[in-house]
Amino acid sequence: MEKVILGKTGLEVSKNGFGALPIQRISKADAVYLLQKAFYNGINYFDTARAYTDSEEKIGAAFEYTRDKIIISTKTAAQTGEDMWKDLEESLRTMKTDYIDIYQFHNPAFCPKPGDESGLYDAALEAKKQGKIRHIGITNHRIAVAKEAIESGLYETLQFPFSYLAADADLEIVEETKKAGMGFIAMKGLSGGLIHNSAAAYAYMAQPQFDHVAPIWGVQRENELDEFLSYQECPPRLDDALMQVIDEDRKQLSGDFCRGCGYCMPCPAGIEINNCARMSLMLRRAPQSGWLSEEWQEKMKKIENCLHCGQCMKKCPYGLNTPELLAKNYEDYKTFLK
């Protein structure tokens, strides 16, 4: 399998990384099966988070006896050093390990630094000295925080959304991490489900200028895993046909659109923002029947109860006018019900 070296960490990871957020939705037995199948077929990098409910526990069950042969990254959303220690100890316990390869701050609104009020970086540094974590990383959806993390020189890896829908500012982040010797871990390679052609997504990431990029693909079903494993044997190339797919997607998905990251949640009015705010796209890019069910009609109707409190706008890492986006999607949705 093609490998990627994560910058100054020196860690050599499979170009296909296993994103373990979706396995929280399946049984422990099914998750262990998928994880072990991935490992025995050449995938050695698994990414999870303390916030992903039982994902860490399932990783621990799958790799208790092969821990030294895999690379694990996990995340803490803690706001203080004290809480970071609690998260770290719990992650170590649930994954049945005494160290984490890459320990990441999970989408913080600021860039943790030594001596700041949060105490997060100081705690991570101490954990590294104790051997409980080997490398300190950060994940983010915000351009400004990502840039600050790169410029600080404090972080060994950056996990950031990246796909062929990336804007110029996103591409600049990718280039800057390479110059800084940081490992770049690409999340949202399928843009939260809006990209349907995984071959095009994979081929785009496989270009020479992205040789330092390690994409992680969220896997929940065996056929999804098989799809990415097949690219190891027969890597898709960025030919005219795949470029046409990319060009069409870029035309349809340019501008302001919801990536479905969910950082706006929860909504005080009970609106499922991360799906409702991109309903127009989902209706046109996926089978419509599921989105037009009575259940989804009720969920979309909740948009009428929007409080216009502005909480979602403040939380949105992409600076979207979320209430306006919800209203537009709702009006469009109603046209499909006539």
Where are the predicted features?
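N-terminal binding-site loop/beta-alpha segment at the start of enzyme catalytic domains
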Residues: 1-70
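Generic structural signal for well-ordered alpha-helices
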Residues: 3, 35, 56, 60, ...
